[in-house]
Design a protein with these regions (language model features):
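Short glycine-rich phosphate-binding loop at a beta-alpha junction
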Residues: 104-110
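Long, low-complexity, Lys/Arg-enriched
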Residues: 1-104, 115-168
Length: 168
């Protein structure tokens, strides 16, 4: 875990890492730039086959955060592959713990595999946990997007907050 040097807001950011480290990193950058979130804690949740990308994602998150003037605590949690019930239970428990500690919780589903995303969202909805944001970086095209967020034309990408979108 990377300890925070600067206390940010009382926000925590849970991000699901699947096949694309770029998707995770770019979604995080978009959330900071477009939504203004400054999480005090970042948790990268991944499945074992994709865990090798997690340290790279953590370093990128740290560098991007520092560029915005803060340093979150970063942790990595690896889960067995395709165990959506276990993934959901772990993410639910993690979110409940963060909320109990006074954090507002945001979840980014952009890079997560469908089974992990489904498990997380089902588990959270069944117990009525109040998640503040569910982020997804929507791309109009997947051509040539494995590069930094600021190098992808903004007209083909849009950070969505599913909680805001469904409340409107």
């Amino acid at each position: 875990m990377i300890d925070p040097e600067i206390a940010g807001s009382r926000d925590a950011y849970i991000t699901l890492l699947g096949r694309s480290t770029w998707a995770l990193v770019n979604a995080y950058h978009a959330v900071l730039r477009e939504k203004g979130l400054r999480p005090e804690r970042v948790s990268i949740v991944t499945e074992e086959p994709y865990a090798e990308g997690a340290p790279t994602a953590a370093r990128a998150i740290l560098m991007i955060s520092e560029g915005y003037g803060f340093t979150p605590a970063i942790e990595i949690e690896a889960l067995p592959r395709a165990e959506f019930v276990r993934a959901g239970a772990m993410i639910r428990s993690f979110a409940e713990g963060l909320i109990a500690q006074g954090y507002g919780v945001a979840i980014d589903i952009t890079s997560g595999r469908k089974v992990t995303v489904a498990g997380a969202l089902i588990a959270i909805s069944l117990v009525g946990i109040r998640i503040q944001h569910i982020y997804y970086l929507a791309m109009q095209s997947l051509d040539d997007v494995a590069k930094p967020y600021m190098m992808i034309p903004h007209q083909i990408q849009r950070i969505r907050d599913l909680m805001e979108d469904t409340a409107a």
